[in-house]
Amino acid sequence: MSTEEFDPLRYETFAGAVVRALLERPMVPLEPLDRFEGAGVYAIFYKGALPFYRVISGRDIPIYVGQAIPEGGRKGGKGLGHQPGGVLYKRLRDHAKSIGQVKNLRAEDFSCRYLVVVPVWVSIAEEFLLKTYQPVWNHLVDGFGNHDPGRGRYDQENSLWDTLHEGRPWAKKLRARKESAGGISSRVEEFLNKLKRERPEIFREKA
């Protein structure tokens, strides 16, 4: 029998427990979403018909994961006693709005799981989710979580996400990428097929 000391705050132990708690939460539509309070982590899932997402469509594999903490939380300015308000709810609402603005996505094709967590532990949980699932909107198609850069900053290149999923009004003001949406979608298919080959355990259906 192993006599290795159990440390409940060890990275793998804690982060794994949070991820399991998140995945045990009910999956709910991204839109509409009832208001709730708190900071935490979330996972967004896709069940639509776009062919380049078919490997994960309708499966319990997130297309995107993220976190929401109060302003100043990343610098340690908000701790155990701070009331974060509705930051996690607002983040999910922002994502639903972004999806609703683009041409080739429908809000009804997205659902989410979210878990309210004490802000100090949120980043650890998000990091573990990213490592475990390698969501395509986090690892390849960057830009989903971007916001309007504001006047005077529109000379920057448009994101991969906004090139593949055109429609956010402010993104139209940015400089076009050289890579086409078709080229990006091909890379998405390659990425997801490789993920399925290399990480078959996350594609197994739950009992």
Regions found by a protein language model. Name each.
Residues M1-I63, Q67-A207:
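Boundary/linker segments flanking structured domains
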